């Protein structure tokens, strides 16, 4: 059996809502809304750019990433390679919205850094996220706390996929309103259905840690 590599973008799905992650990556469900369509158009625009070099920095777009150690793979928007020795690799992720308090976007960036480190035999100390709504670039330190958080999510997301287990909806109802899978997920119905709680209790011993 071929080894499964978890898409790096899936980590952001999990961080936002584990149920959203499972619906997409376990049940293979997907619906597009304005936000996902707008984000897709933004990435298409970024990915279409040609590689270029300016002032000692090479800008590479649509870079394919892969980690055999962590079993993750994906494509990053932009990699800045600072050509002075030792070379510095600086990942940049583009997002349609604005900076967030939560680590959802930073986790995705950190996973990209983990792949770069393995592929290039280097250490990535920081990257950046460009937010289209605010036209701002947020520098993100790839520090120990973010690495630990990212690795925990990789491991837990893998366990959910292997178990074929779809968790309940997030308790944060505000996230549901912007989710493209709201109609498929039906979080309000799930929360009102007492049988769901019964099933959760029935299989409590089998829950994923």
Tell me what each language-model feature is.
Residues 55-156:
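Mg2+/Mn2+-dependent nuclease catalytic core
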Residues 68-69, 118-209:
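Metal-dependent nuclease catalytic regions and adjoining charged, substrate-binding loops involved
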Residues 3-6, 41-46, 61, 110-111, ...:
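Short amphipathic alpha-helical surface micro-motifs
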Residues 4-7, 102, 143, 164:
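A diffuse structural propensity rather than consistent per-protein peaks
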Residues 1-91, 95, 199-209:
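Metal-dependent nuclease catalytic cores that hydrolyze phosphodiester bonds in DNA/RNA
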Residues 8-9, 76, 106-110, 173-177:
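Non-catalytic, well-ordered alpha-helical scaffold segments
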């Amino acid at each position: 059996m071929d080894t499964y590599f978890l898409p790096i973008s899936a980590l952001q799905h999990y961080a936002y809502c584990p149920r959203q992650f499972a619906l997409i990556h376990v049940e293979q469900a997907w619906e597009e809304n304005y936000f996902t369509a707008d984000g897709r158009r933004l990435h298409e625009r970024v990915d279409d750019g040609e590689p270029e070099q300016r002032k000692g920095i090479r800008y590479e777009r649509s870079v394919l990433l892969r980690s055999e150690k962590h079993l993750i793979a994906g494509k990053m928007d932009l990699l800045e390679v600072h050509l002075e020795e030792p070379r510095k690799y600086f990942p940049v992720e583009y997002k349609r919205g604005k900076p967030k308090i939560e680590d959802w976007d930073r986790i995705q960036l950190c996973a990209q850094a983990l792949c770069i480190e393995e592929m290039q035999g280097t250490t990535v100390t920081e990257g950046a996220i460009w937010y289209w709504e605010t036209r701002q670039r947020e520098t993100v330190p790839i520090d120990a706390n973010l690495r630990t958080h990212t690795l925990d999510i990789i491991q837990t997301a893998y366990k959910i996929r292997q178990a074929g287990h779809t968790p309940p909806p997030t308790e944060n109802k505000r996230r549901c309103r912007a989710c493209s899978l709201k109609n498929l997920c039906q979080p309000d119905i799930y929360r009102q259905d007492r049988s769901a709680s019964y099933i959760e209790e029935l299989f409590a011993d089998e829950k994923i840690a």
